[in-house]
Design a protein with these regions (language model features):
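A conserved beta-strand element that flanks and buttresses the S-adenosyl-L-methionine
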Residues: 115
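Short alpha-helix
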Residues: 184
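Short N-terminal helix/helix-N-cap motif within the alpha/beta-hydrolase-1
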Residues: 78, 123-128, 153
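A short glycine-rich, Lys/Arg-flanked "PGG" loop and its adjoining helix->strand segment in the class I
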Residues: 127-142
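Class I SAM-dependent methyltransferase SAM/SAH-binding core
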Residues: 50-103
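Conserved class I S-adenosyl-L-methionine
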Residues: 1-44, 58-62, 82, 142-181
Length: 184
């Protein structure tokens, strides 16, 4: 089962990934994400948001600062631990729990918005997951999914240079490359 491999990998990566997220929260990227999300968010002063695959709490912190209530779920306990620490350090609160996004423990039509960043490629059954997400989304709510092609550096020389520079920086800072998984 793919989820077992994914879970094992990200349990081990939680601390390093959290450091990257903390840096990202201080960058222009965070402001760009916030603007993009709020552009597509339902027009409500206080949104109930579900962050699927929340990792170390990027959206919980960003949207929490805007006055929205964010519930974050992740399949890995270590990511939830990092998210709790990061949200607390930011002086915010969020509901954070370990949960498989294919089987959500929420009533129908719970959330105004569901956001998901960079997990679709890890799902065992994307159709089942999307169906489940839509079940807990309120009528008129928004589902925002962002994923990436992580292997452009294999096909594009310019992307390869960027990837190699970032990988070298990771080696210098952490003593290892971008990904520590043997298949990456």
């Amino acid at each position: 089962m793919q989820n077992d491999k994914i879970k094992e990998y990200w349990e081990g990566e939680a601390g390093i990934y959290s450091e990257g997220i903390k840096a990202e929260l201080k960058s222009e990227t965070a402001e760009n994400w916030k603007n993009l999300i709020l552009e597509y968010a339902p027009e409500k002063e206080h949104l109930e948001v579900l962050d699927v695959g929340c990792g170390p709490g990027f959206f919980e912190i960003m949207l929490g600062k805007e006055g929205h209530h964010v519930t974050g779920i992740d399949i890995t306990e270590n990511m939830i631990h990092e998210a709790k620490e990061n949200v607390k350090a930011a002086g915010l609160s969020a509901d954070l729990m370990t949960m498989d996004c294919h089987n959500l423990n929420f009533p129908d039509e719970t959330f105004d918005m569901i956001i998901c960043r960079n997990i679709t490629w890890t799902l065992d059954d994307p159709q089942k997951a999307y169906k489940e997400w839509l079940r807990v989304l309120k009528k008129g709510g928004r589902l925002l999914v962002s994923d990436a092609c992580w292997y452009l550096h294999l096909y594009d020389e310019e992307k390869k240079k960027i990837y190699e520079a970032h990988d070298a920086a990771m080696w210098e800072k952490y003593g290892r490359g971008i990904h520590a998984h043997e298949d990456a």
